[in-house]
Amino acid sequence: MATTLNPSEISELIKTRIEQVKLSAESRNEGTVTSVSDGIVRIFGLADAMQGEMIELPNKTYALALNLERDSVGAVVLGDYEHLREGDIAKTTGRILEVPVGKSLLGRVVNALGEPIDGKGALGPTQTAPVERVAPGVIWRKSVNQPVQTGYKSVDAMIPIGRGQRELIIGDRQTGKTAMAIDTVISQKDTGIKCVYVAIGQKASTIANIVRKLEENDALDHTIVVAATASESAALQYISAYAGCTMGEYFMDRGEDALIIYDDLSKQAVAYRQISLLLKRPPGREAYPGDVFYLHSRLLERAARVSEEYVEKFTQGEVKGKTGSLTALPIIETQAGDVSAFVPTNVISITDGQIFLETDLFNAGIRPAVNAGISVSRVGGSAQTKIIKKLSGGIRISLAQYRELAAFAQFASDLDETTRKQLERGQRVTELMKQKQYTSMSVANQALSIYAVNEGYLDDVPVDKVLTFEESLHAHFSNTQSALIDKINTSGDWDNNIEAAFKKHIEEFKTTGSW
């Protein structure tokens, strides 16, 4: 006998089934790729894309939305784009580009997206932070009053750099710009300053050599290397500087000191020009886009010395009473010494001073090839170590007078005694400012050398023996006056007792003639 269902049971059953149906609506913004060329994708139908948003493409590929037009979005692909095709689906993610940050990046080599490329396995525990961030406001900043020792006599004496400063290193190719930056990184190994070295558009072999040199000098442990090699896309070369800055800001925000080197911003500007032209943005001077100044200003303004209140607010009270700093050393390559080109003038106007390296000086054997006349540090003077500040005034004057007189001396047949003495002193100062690569010099040894030349102790030393004399003098002091050297290195102070000790022991050393 067939089972009969009454109408009420049927309606109850239907009601139960309807209640059990799970309908989950998902809102997704999708578009279609209409063209792919030279790393640029054009996407039709993405109505709600944001400027700088990550766009998801097939095979876990991402693009960065840069052009928001009326009916399409122009985006630059981060990585390989050979597998992308017209008609592919593109989705908005609602996120802007972020990179990993944290102490586990120290000692590692990563690409522009923060992925390790050194073969040492995955990164340790990290957080992520956006690559683009608004620079700290005026209220949160503090004046620069602590030094960053580069280990170079010529820089620390005449063009001092402070923590939180932006100091440009500018010069033609092969004048020692990268060498100066790497030596500065090596000099920070006992100072607690964390370093970030961003290599933009360099050969992979060059970056490998730099990493090896940092390892040999025990400097890789406090350094993050961000590499966007010449073989990588223009998008990654453009982003790498901002990614490196974000990694450096992690330390600044937590009341620590960090140093970042951008090597070099000329190549970043070229990469950005390439992207802009491919996106059909109108070209300006030297075919650069109109916002190339903003490209560098928004990057370099993120370098700052921030107040205790900023650090306390950022860490939500975990870190108190500590200031943080991010010091930037951007590098710019000039063509035939032309500092009046578009990008060099932009960066000179943004930074707090520049170290100008000259080809003629480099070829003459004066290395580092610093042109003391047009190199300047606008804020570093207030951060200079007391002893170096006291002694270095004479160095600049001696060099300036020497350069001026040397030009006249070529035409003069006979020189008076005063002029001849100034020329001879200038020759010895110039010789003393020479320094080999990877030979960082402590504050005490710099002070000793500067004091010796200022007080005329090198006047009777032949010019070709000046560096030998200096080396022997440092060895003599480290053997006989190690307590004095340690005291100066620790405090950086200058007083009558130190002056008397310098005078007495330099005179003693000269009588031995051991140089």
Curated annotation (Swiss-Prot):
Pfam family, one: ATP-synt_ab_N
Membrane-related topology note: Peripheral membrane protein
Keywords of the record: ATP synthesis, ATP-binding, Cell inner membrane, Cell membrane, CF(1), Hydrogen ion transport, Ion transport, Membrane, Nucleotide-binding, Translocase, Transport
One Gene Ontology cellular component annotation held by this UniProt entry: plasma membrane
Catalyzed reactions per annotation: ATP + H2O + 4 H(+)(in) = ADP + phosphate + 5 H(+)(out)
Cysteine pairs bridged by disulfides in the record: none
Coiled coil residues, start to end: none
Residues the record marks as site: Required for activity: S375
GO terms for MF: ADP binding; ATP binding; proton-transporting ATP synthase activity, rotational mechanism
Predominant place of localization: membrane
Subcellular location(s) per record: Cell inner membrane
Listed PROSITE patterns: ATPASE_ALPHA_BETA (PS00152)
InterPro entries: ATP_synth_asu-like_sf, ATP_synth_asu_C, ATP_synth_asu_C_sf, ATP_synth_F1_a_nt-bd_dom, ATP_synth_F1_asu, ATPase_a/bsu_AS, ATPase_F1/V1/A1_a/bsu_N, ATPase_F1/V1/A1_a/bsu_N_sf
Enzyme class: translocase
EC annotation from Swiss-Prot or TrEMBL: 7.1.2.2
Sites where the protein binds ATP: G171, D172, R173, Q174, T175, G176, K177, T178
Its job: Produces ATP from ADP in the presence of a proton gradient across the membrane. The alpha chain is a regulatory subunit.
Quaternary organization: F-type ATPases have 2 components, CF(1) - the catalytic core - and CF(0) - the membrane proton channel. CF(1) has five subunits: alpha(3), beta(3), gamma(1), delta(1), epsilon(1). CF(0) has three main subunits: a(1), b(2) and c(9-12). The alpha and beta chains form an alternating ring which encloses part of the gamma chain. CF(1) is attached to CF(0) by a central stalk formed by the gamma and epsilon chains, while a peripheral stalk is formed by the delta and b chains.
HAMAP family from the UniProt entry: ATP_synth_alpha_bact (MF_01346)
Family in the record: Belongs to the ATPase alpha/beta chains family.
Designated name of the protein: ATP synthase subunit alpha
